[in-house]
From Swiss-Prot:
Name assigned to this protein: UDP-glycosyltransferase 74C1
Pfam families reported in the protein's UniProt record: UDPGT (PF00201)
Keyword entries, A-Z: Glycosyltransferase, Transferase
Gene3D superfamilies in alphabetical order: Glycogen Phosphorylase B
Alphabetical list of InterPro entries matching this protein: UDP_glucos_trans (IPR002213), UDP_glycos_trans_CS (IPR035595)
Any one cellular-component term (Gene Ontology): peroxisome
Molecular-function GO terms, alphabetical: UDP-glucosyltransferase activity
Species the sequence originates in: Arabidopsis thaliana (Mouse-ear cress)
Presence of the UniProt keyword Glycosyltransferase in the record: yes
Positions of UDP-alpha-D-glucose binding: 281, 336-338, 353-361, 375-378
Coiled-coil spans in chain: none
Length: 457
């Protein structure tokens, strides 16, 4: 049972699943500490509001200025249109909510949308910036915004090492993709950097990490801002189990039916024998890269489970899926319950794009990683996975950005059965323990959440 309700908080995530999920998870934690939450999703599709049965969380959509017939990624290109329309919609929503029987006290917003801070301040709300990505990438973006780091004109002509507080030296290949080369992602470069344009006006700053994971970076950050690290916000079943009904990222009223076929297939494999491959919901690999991965998997001879979206399946080699099924050596699935998969005893390693949510999930469940980073924060995450936390290895690319089948296979074998793989398993088990301690009762992140609740009541 949750405590008597103490306050009402609005959540405003950037409308991508990787940003929405950490917001939902924090709302669940706050619900059990007596806070009522409203999740506001900017969308071109109107949905009727609904309230979760298990939590005091209501979900509303507001219009983002786009229409159903437009490309789903249009909002990521026409940023001004998204900003202007969503600003109006958010202002109207908050103004109306303040007239309700349970008016909100605070807005927790994604810094990808700094305009939300200005709106909330104008409407007299306590304003909280919530970074759903790690400090690793955010610190780089901060220094670009401050002018203390210059993005090179050409990453290949200027391969100098970059230095940031609390970081090891970073090569150009270790930096977030938006920080590697001027002009490569002009709109998105501005988008991620302007997170810091008004951050000092926030009343509180949260991040989906934990103190023990990024200690040197966290120390520097704490000297700059009122930072509270409240992660990892992975569903409670896979961490402290204090919210036994919290088994996935969905809310009770929006749950999809689980696909038991994947877990049944894994149940017939020996312990730590399966290579799990997944590249998230946004990454679209080239056909050439997909074929290199497929050949690498076949070359290693390990059982494999590969999550491949329907839109990507045509990039696989002809006959690859059928051959795997015929030999019972692998399974290519359109969707998998990733947390359940990573928690399964049959999984030996995780071949991943190193997105932050996937990285935290692997770390929390003690699964070694083979990193194949693509863009955004992923290269920096991969650097820390391999060289700082030492919980995986990173696949290298050639001059054209392609990872060869030989390189991918080498890394998989190294993690699955090499001497380095043994050390990696020890290291990821240590971090697994630290992650669970942080979010468990009395842990560093749990204390930060309690401190945050106290600010709201």
């Amino acid at each position: 049972m949750s405590e008597a309700k103490k306050g009402h908080v609005l959540f405003f995530p950037y409308p991508l699943q990787g940003h929405i999920n950490p917001m939902i998870q924090l709302a669940k934690r706050l619900s059990k500490k007596g806070i009522t939450s409203t999740l506001i999703i900017a969308s071109k599709d109107h949905r009727e509001p609904y309230t979760s049965d298990d939590y005091s969380i209501t979900v509303h959509t507001i219009h983002d200025g786009f229409f159903p017939h437009e490309h789903p990624h249009a909002k990521f290109v026409d940023l001004d249109r998204f900003h202007n329309s969503t600003s109006r919609s958010l202002t109207d929503f908050i103004s109306s909510a303040k007239l309700s029987d349970n008016p909100p006290k605070a807005l927790i917003y994604d810094p990808f949308m700094p305009f939300a801070l200005d709106i909330a301040k104008d409407l007299d709300l306590y304003v909280v910036a919530y970074f759903t990505q790690p400090w690793l990438a955010s610190l780089v973006y901060y220094h670009i915004n401050e002018g203390t780091y210059d993005v090179p004109v050409d990453r290949h002509e200027n391969p100098t090492l970059a230095s940031f507080p609390g970081f090891p030296l970073l090569s150009q290949d270790d930096l977030p993709s938006f920080a590697c080369e001027k002009g490569s992602y002009p709109l998105l470069h501005e988008f991620v950097v302007r997170q810091f344009s008004n951050l000092l006006q926030a009343d509180c700053i949260l991040c989906n990490t934990f103190d023990q994971l990024e200690p040197k970076v966290v120390k520097w950050m704490n000297d700059q801002w009122p930072v509270k690290n409240i992660g990892p916000v992975v569903p409670s079943k896979f961490l402290d189990n204090r919210l036994p009904e919290d088994k996935d990222y969905e809310l009770e009223n929006s749950k999809t039916e689980p696909d038991e076929s994947v877990l049944k297939w894994l149940g017939n494999r020996p312990a730590k024998s399966v290579v799990y491959v997944a590249f998230g919901t946004l990454v679209a690999l080239s056909e050439k890269q997909m074929k290199e991965i497929a050949m690498a998997i076949s070359q290693t001879g390990y059982h494999f489970l590969w999550s491949v979206r329907e839109s990507e399946r045509s990039k696989l080699p002809s006959g690859f899926i059928e051959e795997a099924e015929e030999k019972d050596s692998g399974l290519v699935a359109k969707w998998v319950p990733q947390l359940e998969v990573l928690a399964h005893e049959s999984i030996g390693c995780f071949v991943s794009h190193c997105g932050w949510n996937s990285t935290l999930e692997a770390l929390c469940l003690g699964v070694p990683m083979v990193g194949v980073p693509q863009w955004t924060d992923q290269p920096t995450n991969a650097k820390f996975i391999e060289d700082v936390w030492k919980i995986g290895v990173r696949v290298r690319t050639d001059g054209e950005g392609l990872s060869s089948k030989e390189e991918i296979a080498r890394c998989i074998v190294e993690v699955m059965e090499g001497e380095r793989g043994k050390e990696i398993r020890k290291n990821v088990e240590k971090l697994k323990v630290l992650a669970r301690e942080a979010i468990s009762e009395g842990g560093s992140s749990d204390k930060k959440i309690d401190e945050f609740v106290a600010l709201l009541t």
